[in-house]
């Protein structure tokens, strides 16, 4: 019965590492080979066009339609030399992936033949039929027009035979239908607010960048085994499967030697990533078996987001070439760690100052403390929203599930930085005033040696940890678009820095120096945002109670957490910064609720199918064999002897009967519960119904299936088991 399972397991065991081509050049030589970067722009564009385009990229100058044709023509020439025949606007709709529609360069030449053509108009703007992308009701199908517009701040690149142009995607009436539009607006708002604050310390600052360095965790599974698991195939996670006797308890996988087959995949992936200009740097085994991590050197946030989207699709492609499937789902396997995507985030200026790194002088440290405290304030004020920004049906399996970050946002600072803030909190104006007066810039700010901070104790349970020169937002899901978290965080920072500037300006007077005013405001903030600081164990029960006392958002229901986007403080934050309108927020929430419902719905269907046509039949078949055995024993032996010999089997027969009955009944109940939920019109209420009634049933049914897996004859079991999925290379 399960010959397929044994065949795929055997094949997976025997699969050798694949060959792949290693470039003859060094990485520094092939880095960015397929990217139209500055070097290429310089080579393929006329001098004046190059200068104008650089102005557009660096200073956000408007794109002069006069140069668009020449830019497009240069791009086309470069792309065609690499073998490209098509181009596409590449955008990030409100699904977890990217979207593209390829058009060939060909046009009629007017003489009955064809020619390669790519105009500025096609580069700059297009109108893909947008009606089938999630839009939360912003457009009805009869008003399907939306358009994509080039984002010159992210360079175009070639994948296979296609020139890919990063674009934003908006409705005809201007509402954003993607992740990039609000991200660019958030970055612009943050830049403006942060530059203003920087001017307290350095009037020459012109621009503040938001930096993002993501760490991408993922699982690899042999593709034959993957294909034999319909749940993995259709939902990205295993909906059933008993824990293997050995999983991660020995902690022997973390940083262990990378298996040869996996190493080949990683090398191939890295080469292709570098060719696409993604500066990948770090790779290692993660905690769980078959779990790995990949991290690049951090980049400007918008580019880093694009690169993460690109690498996720590259990973899928390269994995298949190596006979693997990559699992980006946050929780593919029960009982072992899930995958996250730590978002390392910091701010830095155009003149090279890292705003979240301690400095050497008191003045530098005042600036450092200013940005740290404002970050804490932003996170404190919007902790519920930040949680909503990383929440999804899939990431819900990680959050609060006694691993990875808890479902409460708090920030870990480490002993040293905590002490500095505590010290500032209790200091008085007099301390400060005297010192400022006497020594000019010599403020009473403790020296903070950079090295020490860099080695601060790590707290793996903290969802938002300070790590020396950046904050690490760990709660982001492995499958998510980083933009969601980055939009919320940078917008919160924009609002907070704007408020800070206003507060400091108000506090300054003839008697109160700028430094004193800054310290006064910071001291107040340190007191206000104290509830967000937590250095203890984020997984503990005590913390849940304590966090509730502190007034932090402790909600655990995914669809209810989404409400945070529509709270008064969130709407004020997004609208005052010009990042999103109320209509956009409402539409996006509709998409979130709908997506949530659909994901649970699909899981429920798949589990129902598998239960009824894999598990119950196999269990029943095994049960029949046992029954047969019981009868045969009766024929061979006298009644009392046969009874004694059959006792074990009879209890197994009973257990199988009970569990299969339970499974059948609950699959029926789940269908009924879906019918009830599906009749609810309100998308939010429907999502809540799916969360409250259907999601728990998945777990209950699974429980009995996993118990059956332990007693049914291994020969008969059709689905590859955890021990096979997780330990084969
Ligand atoms: P760890 O696992 O110790 O957190 P990794 O090396 O796996 O460290 O990843 C750290 C990530 O943080 C990398 O992507 C790195 O580029 C990024 N990073 C380092 N410094 C900064 C910074 N100042 N701002 C943003 N990201 C940073
Ligand atoms: Mg990290």
Predicted regions and their residues:
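N-terminal hydrophobic targeting/anchoring segments and the immediately downstream early-domain regions
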Residues: 1-24, 141-157, 162
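C-terminal amphipathic alpha-helical interaction region
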Residues: 518, 525-729
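Active-site-proximal loop/turn and secondary-structure-junction residues that shape catalytic pockets
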Residues: 67-71, 91-93, 121-122, 169, ...
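Histidine/acidic residue-rich metal-binding segments in metalloenzymes
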Residues: 13-119, 124-140
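Active-site proximal loops enriched in glycine and acidic residues that flank catalytic Cys/His/Asp
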Residues: 67, 91, 119, 296-298, ...
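Short linear, low-complexity motifs centered on an aromatic residue
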Residues: 96-113, 130-131, 229, 236-238, ...
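Hydrophobic/aromatic-rich, well-ordered segments within soluble, folded domains that form packed cores
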Residues: 84, 88-91, 307-320, 347, ...
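Glycine-rich, acidic/polar active-site loops that bind/position phosphate-bearing ligands
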Residues: 143-328, 337-340, 347-590
């Amino acid at each position: 019965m399960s010959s397929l399972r044994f065949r795929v397991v055997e094949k997976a065991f025997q699969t050798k590492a694949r060959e792949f081509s290693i470039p003859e050049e060094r990485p520094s030589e092939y880095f960015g080979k397929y990217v139209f970067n500055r070097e290429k722009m310089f080579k393929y564009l006329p001098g004046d066009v190059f200068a104008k385009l650089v102005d557009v990229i660096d200073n956000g100058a408007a794109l002069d339609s006069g140069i668009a044709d020449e830019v497009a023509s240069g791009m086309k020439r470069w792309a065609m030399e690499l073998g490209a025949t098509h181009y596409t606007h590449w955008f990030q709709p409100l699904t977890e992936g990217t979207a593209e529609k390829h058009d060939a360069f060909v046009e009629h030449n007017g003489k009955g033949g064809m020619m390669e053509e790519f105009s500025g108009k096609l580069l700059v703007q297009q109108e893909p039929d947008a009606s089938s992308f999630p839009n939360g009701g912003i457009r009805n199908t009869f008003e399907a027009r939306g358009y994509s517009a080039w984002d010159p701040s992210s360079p175009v690149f070639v994948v296979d035979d296609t020139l890919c142009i990063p674009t934003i995607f908006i409705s005809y009436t201007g509402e954003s239908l993607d992740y990039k539009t609000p991200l660019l607006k958030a970055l612009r708002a943050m830049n403006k607010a942060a530059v203003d604050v920087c001017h307290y310390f350095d009037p020459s600052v012109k621009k503040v960048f938001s930096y993002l360095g993501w760490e991408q965790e993922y699982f690899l599974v042999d593709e034959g085994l993957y294909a034999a698991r319909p749940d993995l195939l259709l939902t990205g996670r295993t909906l059933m499967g008993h824990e293997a006797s050995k999983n991660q308890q020995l902690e022997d996988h973390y940083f262990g030697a990378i298996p040869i087959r996996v190493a080949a995949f990683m090398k191939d992936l890295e080469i292709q990533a570098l060719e696409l200009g993604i500066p990948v740097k770090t790779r290692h085994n993660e905690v769980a078996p078959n779990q790995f991590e990949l991290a690049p050197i951090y980049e400007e946030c918008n580019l880093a987001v694009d690169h993460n989207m690109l690498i996720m699709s590259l990973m899928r492609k390269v994995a298949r070439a190596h006979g693997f499937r990559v699992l980006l789902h946050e929780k593919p396997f029960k009982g072992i760690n899930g995958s996250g995507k730590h978002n390392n985030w910091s701010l830095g200026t155009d003149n090279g100052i890292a705003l979240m790194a301690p400095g050497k002088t008191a003045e530098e440290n005042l600036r450092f403390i200013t940005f740290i405290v404002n970050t804490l304030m932003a996170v404190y004020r919007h902790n519920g929203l930040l949680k909503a920004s990383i929440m999804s049906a899939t990431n819900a399996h990680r959050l609060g599930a006694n691993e990875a970050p808890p479902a409460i946002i708090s920030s870990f600072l480490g002993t040293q930085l905590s002490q500095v803030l505590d010290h500032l909190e209790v200091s008085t104006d007099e301390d400060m005033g005297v010192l400022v007066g006497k020594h000019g810039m010599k403020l009473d700010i403790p020296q903070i040696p950079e090295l020490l901070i860099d080695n601060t104790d790590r707290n793996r349970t903290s969802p938002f940890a300070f790590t020396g020169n950046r904050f690490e937002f760990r709660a982001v899901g492995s499958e998510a678009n980083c933009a969601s978290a980055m939009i919320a965080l940078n917008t919160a920072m924009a609002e907070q820095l704007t408020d800070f500037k206003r507060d400091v300006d108000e506090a300054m007077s003839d008697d109160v120096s700028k430094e004193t005013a800054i310290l006064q405001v910071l001291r107040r903030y340190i007191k206000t945002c104290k509830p967000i600081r937590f250095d203890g164990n984020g997984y503990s029960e005590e913390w849940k109670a304590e966090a509730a006392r502190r007034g932090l958002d402790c909600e655990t229901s995914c669809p209810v957490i989404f409400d945070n986007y529509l709270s008064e403080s969130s709407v004020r934050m997004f609208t005052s910064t010009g990042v999103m309108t109320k209509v956009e927020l409402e539409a996006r929430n509709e998409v979130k609720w709908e997506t949530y419902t659909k994901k649970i719905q699909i899981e429920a269907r798949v589990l129902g199918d598998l239960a009824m046509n894999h598990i119950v039949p196999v269990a029943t078949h095994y049960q029949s064999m046992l029954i047969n055995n019981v009868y045969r024993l009766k024929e061979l032996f006298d009644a009392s002897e046969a009874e004694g010999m059959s006792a074990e089997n009879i209890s197994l027969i009973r257990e199988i009967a009970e569990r299969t009955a339970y499974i059948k009944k609950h699959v029926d109940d789940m269908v009924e519960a879906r019918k009830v939920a599906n009749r609810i019109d309100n998308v939010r209420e429907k999502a809540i119904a799916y969360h409250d009634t259907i999601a728990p049933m998945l777990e209950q049914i699974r429980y009995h299936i996993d118990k059956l897996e332990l007693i049914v004859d291994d020969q008969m079991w059709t689905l590859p088991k955890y021990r096979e999925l997780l330990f084969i290379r």
